[in-house]
């Protein structure tokens, strides 16, 4: 008799999506050699957001040495609940999920992708150290090869108030009882010739023969945060070489994640996604909110009079949000009526409310921070409300009014150092007040040409001693990939 195999159906935990180089490349959208940029970008974004939410002008320190990268801030301190959620790999917890807004991190699961990194790049000693709210967490995260589940070790100790930080984050005083310091740590790798390598694909980061392009990219990524955030004071400590960019306007403001979002930024599929997220949350917490309570979350609908008009037009007085689910599906027809009523009784948001970096700040940054010639500095700002047809709802006449603000700045370095690395073209790009790891402006409108091609046409090639900055504030920034390497810009 011919032998027959009765295959067993095996279940693999989705927790494994974070515990290998391949999976983390998928989650972050970046190869291992770019993970140091991912670490800095995500942690500085989180630090700046936390300070803004607390009404504190952010002060952020980025420290890099042979065995670690550390980000420290002066914010309110990472909540224990947020840390615990980031270490639960069975769920995805995010305060950004579902909302449409000009926030720095729309995915909101940055910490979850960062915690497994130390053991992926250094299986023996890699670890994460978090200091916040008077406690020091030494965290190691790995995967059990048999059960394929996450194994999390979090050793917690109180930080004596009289002692300095264990992280050695320069000599800048940081009140760790009210701030957060996160250090990704690995074993130092120094070669006989003095070259120091990081375990991210063997990157040479310090020494005579180190990869200058990497060091330059790392530095420019850090500096980009200061360029696009006038209220930020940024300290950079690269192997003991320190640089500080002071805030030019500590009271500068922008649209915050805690600000109510505008219904004019939503199309039907966006509102359905948000409603579904609220219903799921209410089921998990034993609630069943009214549509009226849901409306309070939106810009221009905090007053009862406006809400009553919306509810009357939509026929949803005393209607519960869960009633918008019929036989296991969202009632798109009723939600479309609700969306139309919400837009009819509110005003679109003016583009200036998103936040404007401003000419004064950029001039000071280009001249004092980067060394550009004052007389060469140029600045441009374009703002508008973009009319986007709502094709999903089937009614092309109805539209979303999406505000946007694009700012650009140019400066000439002078070329006095005869081809030095700092005297080549430097491009800084960002969206929603966060700097980009790669230039995301790959295609403008219908021409298909990107930023570099546009600069080349203006005789500003890669070898020219200039600095160019481009920033877009937009509540519905869309990227072509998870790594945010290409932004979609309509023309």
Kindly label every feature range from the protein language model.
Residues 1-6, 148, 152-155, 160-164, ...:
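Charged regulatory segments coupled to nucleotide-binding catalytic modules in large multidomain enzymes
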Residues 1-177, 181-182, 294, 298-303:
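GHKL (Bergerat-fold) ATPase N-terminal catalytic module, capturing the glycine-rich phosphate-binding loop
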Residues 47-50, 89-93, 117-121, 224-229, ...:
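Conserved, well-folded catalytic cores of nucleic-acid-processing
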Residues 99-102, 234-239, 292-296, 308-310, ...:
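Short coil/turn segments at secondary-structure boundaries
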Residues 124-129, 133-136, 277-351:
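Accessory alpha-helical DNA-binding modules that contact the DNA backbone or grooves
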Residues 311, 323-324, 336-450, 460-461, ...:
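Prokaryote-biased recognition of long, low-complexity C-terminal linker/tail segments
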């Amino acid at each position: 008799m011919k032998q027959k195999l009765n295959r067993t159906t095996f279940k693999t935990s989705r927790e494994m999506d974070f515990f290998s180089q391949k999976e983390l490349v998928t989650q972050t959208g970046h190869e291992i050699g770019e993970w140091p940029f991912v670490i800095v970008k995500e942690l500085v974004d989180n630090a700046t957001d936390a300070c803004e939410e607390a009404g504190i002008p952010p002060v952020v320190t980025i420290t890099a040495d042979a065995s670690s990268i550390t980000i420290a801030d002066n914010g309110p301190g990472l909540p224990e609940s947020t840390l615990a959620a980031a270490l639960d790999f069975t769920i995805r917890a995010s305060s950004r999920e579902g909302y449409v807004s000009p926030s720095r991190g729309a995915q909101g699961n940055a910490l979850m992708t960062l915690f497994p990194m130390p053991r992926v790049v250094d299986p023996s000693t890699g670890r994460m150290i978090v200091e916040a709210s008077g406690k020091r967490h030494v965290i190691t995260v790995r995967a059990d090869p048999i059960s394929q589940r996450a194994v999390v070790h979090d050793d917690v100790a109180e930080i004596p108030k009289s002692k300095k930080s264990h992280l050695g984050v320069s000599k800048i005083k940081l009140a760790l009882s009210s701030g957060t310091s996160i250090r990704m740590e690995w074993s130092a790798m120094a070669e006989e010739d003095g070259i120091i390598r990081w375990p991210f694909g063997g990157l040479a980061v310090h020494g005579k023969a180190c990869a200058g392009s990497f060091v330059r990219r790392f530095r420019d990524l850090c500096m980009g945060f200061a360029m696009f955030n006038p209220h930020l004071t940024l300290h950079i400590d690269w192997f003991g070489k320190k640089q500080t960019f002071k805030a030019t306007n500590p009271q500068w403001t922008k649209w915050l994640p805690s600000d109510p979002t505008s219904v004019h930024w939503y199309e039907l599929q966006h509102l359905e996604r948000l409603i579904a997220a609220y219903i799921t949350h209410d089921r998990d917490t034993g609630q069943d909110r009214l549509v009226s309570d849901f409306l309070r979350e939106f810009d221009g609908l905090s007053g009862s009079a406006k809400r009553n008009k919306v509810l009357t037009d939509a026929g949803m007085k005393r209607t519960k949000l869960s009633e918008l689910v019929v036989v296991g599906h969202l009632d798109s027809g009723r939600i479309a009526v609700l969306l139309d009523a919400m837009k009819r009784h509110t005003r679109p948001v003016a583009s200036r409310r998103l936040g404007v970096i401003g000419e004064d700040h950029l001039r000071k940054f280009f001249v004092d921070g980067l060394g550009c010639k004052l007389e060469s500095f140029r600045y441009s700002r374009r703002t508008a409300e973009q009319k986007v047809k709502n094709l999903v709802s089937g009614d092309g006449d109805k539209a979303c009014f999406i505000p946007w603000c694009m700012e650009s700045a140019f400066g000439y370095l002078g070329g006095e150092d005869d081809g030095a690395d700092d005297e080549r073209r430097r491009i800084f790009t960002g969206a929603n007040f966060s700097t980009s790891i790669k230039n995301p402006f790959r295609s403008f409108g219908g021409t298909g040409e990107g930023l570099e091609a546009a600069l080349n046409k203006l005789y500003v090639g890669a070898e020219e001693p200039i600095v160019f900055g481009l920033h877009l504030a937009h509540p519905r920034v869309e990227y072509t990939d998870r790594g945010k390497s290409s932004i979609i810009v309509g023309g």
